[in-house]
């Protein structure tokens, strides 16, 4: 089992990255959008936690920034009708901790934000995983715990057209810079960061 790959980024795309290891072997890892956004530039060193899927016709290596994110991916594979491509799509649309919270809270609507996940599929994922998701362990420390205030702000940004990943990231940055008193000020702060890009 290949559980981790460390090396130099040779090439990267939205859904994959090619890494040349010190031994001279290059690995192509399929990645969620959140990993692509956090990758250093080509020529820089990166370490990814990986999961290998072996099929009769191909071997695919999936790469993640944290072991926790990989654990959520692996747990998603235990849901009926969820293969590696859909599990990767879920982690491209939602952060790992948001996936875990959605499962704990049986939040069908959050899972339905993911392309190719309708109500029936979301309900099936929750049915299969809601009682098992604790096995992935705690999320890595980020300095800021999720809050109802932050969740409301993220929902507001998504309603304005931003995706889950960028909304989560902007809201977390505002919270870390100083706790806002209400949702509207948090949304305004997040919007100023998003529009400044």
UniProtKB/Swiss-Prot annotation:
SMART domains: HhH1
Localization in the cell: Cytoplasm
Keywords, comma-separated and alphabetical: Cytoplasm, DNA damage, DNA recombination, DNA repair, DNA-binding
Main location: cytoplasm
Region (Domain I): 1-65
Signal peptide: none
Region (Domain III): 145-197
Chain spans, region Flexible linker: 140-144
Protein purpose: The RuvA-RuvB-RuvC complex processes Holliday junction (HJ) DNA during genetic recombination and DNA repair, while the RuvA-RuvB complex plays an important role in the rescue of blocked DNA replication forks via replication fork reversal (RFR). RuvA specifically binds to HJ cruciform DNA, conferring on it an open structure. The RuvB hexamer acts as an ATP-dependent pump, pulling dsDNA into and through the RuvAB complex. HJ branch migration allows RuvC to scan DNA until it finds its consensus sequence, where it cleaves and resolves the cruciform DNA.
Similarity remark: Belongs to the RuvA family.
Subunit structure, interactors included: Homotetramer. Forms an RuvA(8)-RuvB(12)-Holliday junction (HJ) complex. HJ DNA is sandwiched between 2 RuvA tetramers; dsDNA enters through RuvA and exits via RuvB. An RuvB hexamer assembles on each DNA strand where it exits the tetramer. Each RuvB hexamer is contacted by two RuvA subunits (via domain III) on 2 adjacent RuvB subunits; this complex drives branch migration. In the full resolvosome a probable DNA-RuvA(4)-RuvB(12)-RuvC(2) complex forms which resolves the HJ.
Annotated protein name in UniProt: Holliday junction branch migration complex subunit RuvA
Native organism: Gemmatimonas aurantiaca (strain DSM 14586 / JCM 11422 / NBRC 100505 / T-27)
Taxon lineage: Bacteria, Pseudomonadati, Gemmatimonadota, Gemmatimonadia, Gemmatimonadales
């Amino acid at each position: 089992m290949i559980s981790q790959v460390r090396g130099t980024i040779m090439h990267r795309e939205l859904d994959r990255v090619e890494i040349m290891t010190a031994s001279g072997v290059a690995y192509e890892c399929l990645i969620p959008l959140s990993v692509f956004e956090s990758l250093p530039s080509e020529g820089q060193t990166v370490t990814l936690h990986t999961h290998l899927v072996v099929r009769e016709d191909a071997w695919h290596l999936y790469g993640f920034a944290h072991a926790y994110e990989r654990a959520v991916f692996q747990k998603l594979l235990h849901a009926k009708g969820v293969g590696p491509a859909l599990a990767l799509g879920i982690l491209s649309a939602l952060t790992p901790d948001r996936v875990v919270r959605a499962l704990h809270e049986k939040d069908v609507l959050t899972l339905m934000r993911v392309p190719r996940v309708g109500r029936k599929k979301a309900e099936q994922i929750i049915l299969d995983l809601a009682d098992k998701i604790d096995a992935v362990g705690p999320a890595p420390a980020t300095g800021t715990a999720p809050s109802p205030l932050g969740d409301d702000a993220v929902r507001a940004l998504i309603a304005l057209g931003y995706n889950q990943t960028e909304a989560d990231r902007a809201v977390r940055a505002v919270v870390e810079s100083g706790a806002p008193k209400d949702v509207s000020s948090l949304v305004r702060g997040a919007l100023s960061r998003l529009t400044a890009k």
